[in-house]
Design a protein with these regions (language model features):
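Short alpha-helix in the alpha/beta-hydrolase fold that links the catalytic acid
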Residues: 132, 145-155
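Hydrolase active-site cap/lid region
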Residues: 56-115, 132
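Short beta-strand/loop motif that positions the catalytic acidic residue
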Residues: 130-131, 136-138, 142
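Gly/Ala-rich beta-loop-alpha elbow adjacent to hydrolase catalytic centers
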Residues: 43-47, 51
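Catalytic histidine-centered segment of alpha/beta-hydrolase-like enzymes
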Residues: 169-183
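Conserved alpha/beta-hydrolase
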Residues: 1-8
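Alpha/beta-hydrolase active-site loop
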Residues: 12-38
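Catalytic histidine neighborhood in serine/cysteine hydrolases
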Residues: 154-173, 188
Length: 206
């Protein structure tokens, strides 16, 4: 589904926009064909931020959560915005204008910095709280989300987390010609989700 502030999402990104994702869980709870005890979430980049929040706030309703390159704290600090996100070459488009678009009435760099301070999971006093079981994937060479944010998440909470860190990978752990998205998804993420949900992984014919 589209995350807050993107695509057809009905609301913009904000410190409380995770309420939209909680409504999705409410809806799934009304569907008779859905096993309410085996709901998982997977998030990528900004989606990984929301996935991390949901792993904390909706721990009781999520069986497990996998996230790729989740920003947690340093990503939202002024120094990182100015030194790493502004003019970032790893992102396919102009990242700062793209970030402005997910927030309501944010049109300047100073406003981005102000909004980002509110989004930090440390500033929201969430990092360190209990979480659902998590798989955290990242690349050490990521220029969009600092690897320190990943380690900060791994070091927090109440239960051990599974990690897949590619020392030669960039954003999402991708490595050109070695670890493209399909390989990461099929060989790392899907087996982990299947194992944690008690489901049989798809064979190579699917």
């Amino acid at each position: 589904m589209d995350g807050p502030g993107t695509g057809q999402s009905p609301i913009k990104a904000s410190p409380t926009a995770d309420r939209m994702l909680s409504r999705v869980l409410d809806y799934l709870g009304t569907r008779p064909e859905v096993d309410k005890t085996r709901i998982a979430m997977h998030g990528v980049s900004w989606g990984a931020y929301w996935g991390t929040k949901m792993a904390i706030l909706e721990k009781a309703r999520l069986k497990c959560v996998s996230v790729q390159s989740p920003p947690t704290d340093l990503f939202f600090q002024k120094e990182f915005v100015l030194n790493s996100l502004l003019g970032n070459r790893e992102y396919l488009f102009d990242q700062i204008p793209a970030i402005m678009a997910i927030f309501d009435n944010v049109t300047t760099l100073d406003q981005v910095v102000d909004e980002f301070q509110k989004m930090s999971l440390v500033n929201q006093h969430l990092l360190g709280q209990p979480t659902a079981p998590m798989l955290i994937l990242a690349g050490t060479l990521d220029t969009q989300v600092p690897i320190s944010d990943i380690y900060k998440l791994l070091d927090s909470g109440d239960v051990p987390k599974d990690a897949w860190i590619n020392p030669k990978g960039g954003h999402l752990g991708r490595q050109v010609g070695v670890w493209p998205d399909p390989r990461i998804f099929n060989q790392v993420i899907l087996p982990w989700l299947a194992r944690n949900l008690g489901a049989k992984p798809l064979d190579d014919k699917h």
